Amino acid sequence: MAKQQEAELIFIPFPIPGHILATIELAKRLISHQPSRIHTITILHWSLPFLPQSDTIAFLKSLIETESRIRLITLPDVQNPPPMELFVKASESYILEYVKKMVPLVRNALSTLLSSRDESDSVHVAGLVLDFFCVPLIDVGNEFNLPSYIFLTCSASFLGMMKYLLERNRETKPELNRSSDEETISVPGFVNSVPVKVLPPGLFTTESYEAWVEMAERFPEAKGILVNSFESLERNAFDYFDRRPDNYPPVYPIGPILCSNDRPNLDLSERDRILKWLDDQPESSVVFLCFGSLKSLAASQIKEIAQALELVGIRFLWSIRTDPKEYASPNEILPDGFMNRVMGLGLVCGWAPQVEILAHKAIGGFVSHCGWNSILESLRFGVPIATWPMYAEQQLNAFTIVKELGLALEMRLDYVSEYGEIVKADEIAGAVRSLMDGEDVPRRKLKEIAEAGKEAVMDGGSSFVAVKRFIDGL
């Protein structure tokens, strides 16, 4: 039998930490899975004008410095980017327009890569692996006769929503209406009807809705879709896509992919301070509050959380992302005397090493914004979640893990930070009490899912097999 040609894959991730980290971890997994088949993974990195490019590049390089088979190519900046007013009004539309302007830059990069090869080369470029925001670049792959795959850093349930948008648009319906509290829809892969109000906020404005639909329309053009989830977690959704409805592309459940390092310029002294404090706490006694790496809470909301933590009197670790417009450090915005009153009971920090924290025996609950990476990390260690979604698809994630999967405690399902509502201290305190002391927390089920997640990526597990199927199909 002739030796199979080695493959190179070109990854184009979305340039924010959660997406970049998941992409790097996927690249490592593919190479380690079949090192004789996956020779190289090239990452084409790009940035948005308002993101700190130098920090991100340094971060990327640190993640791959020991990975000789992963290489990084930084694309030039886009000339004449869309106006920032569009981002403020409809961020999804801005991102899609920006990616379209990247087409000539990606074309040049691919042309250079491919022109350096000849027919006798033992390594061939097998395809593009695109973040779902980058689906306009499928056109560039087609120009070079390269198949495109989509890497979905979100859930299989999110993929069901994208399939729903595709079907809905065939009926030429306008953007959705959030004001109808009673309205529910049937989403592929869901057992329960889905309330409209838990869909991404962008679906309720014309410009962003059109961008979402445009992305959904490109998904069927992919040769396959890689999803950071696993069969035991989202069985109904994966069963739906296994049936290949409307000749939809093959879907590969390749998760859970966990990201161990989520911060450029890692502050080791802060990490050590946090972990040392946790070491001194009793088992399962600490509630961890963390709301992601992209957005900061309003100063008034910070004060309500602080009041809630005083009310419940439970040990806590609270990560506060600062907002330069309102406060440069947590101490500036916390209520007067708060730190003295909770001394010995709680710890407030800026950045926190989330995976290490969730893995720590002292953690007994997690109040989370419900980013998909955070959900997978919490499930991996069997830590109960109280849901407080903020933006993007987090409301749908919250609905999925509370109502569809029965794996989390509902604090809020449809909260959207940009609408300006302040959640009051009493409500937060009640959720924290229920999370840490309540009988409704599905601890046995969480333990089973944690074990299933471990088994999925082991030799012979469902995600292990899915990765093999993907590589064999290159």
From Swiss-Prot:
Entry's family note: Belongs to the UDP-glycosyltransferase family.
Name recorded for this polypeptide: UDP-glycosyltransferase 71C2
SUPFAM superfamilies: UDP-Glycosyltransferase/glycogen phosphorylase
Coiled-coil regions, chain positions: none
Record key words, sorted: Glycosyltransferase, Transferase
Lineage: Eukaryota, Viridiplantae, Streptophyta, Embryophyta, Tracheophyta
Sites where the protein binds UDP-alpha-D-glucose: 293, 352-354, 369-377, 391-394
Assigned EC number: 2.4.1.-
Function statement: Possesses low quercetin 3-O-glucosyltransferase, 7-O-glucosyltransferase and 3'-O-glucosyltransferase activities in vitro. Glucosylates other secondary metabolites in vitro like vanillin, trans-resveratrol, curumin and etoposide.
Domain of life: Eukaryota
One MF term in the entry's GO annotations: quercetin 3-O-glucosyltransferase activity
Gene3D superfamilies to which the protein is assigned, alphabetical: Glycogen Phosphorylase B (3.40.50.2000)
Keyword Glycosyltransferase: yes
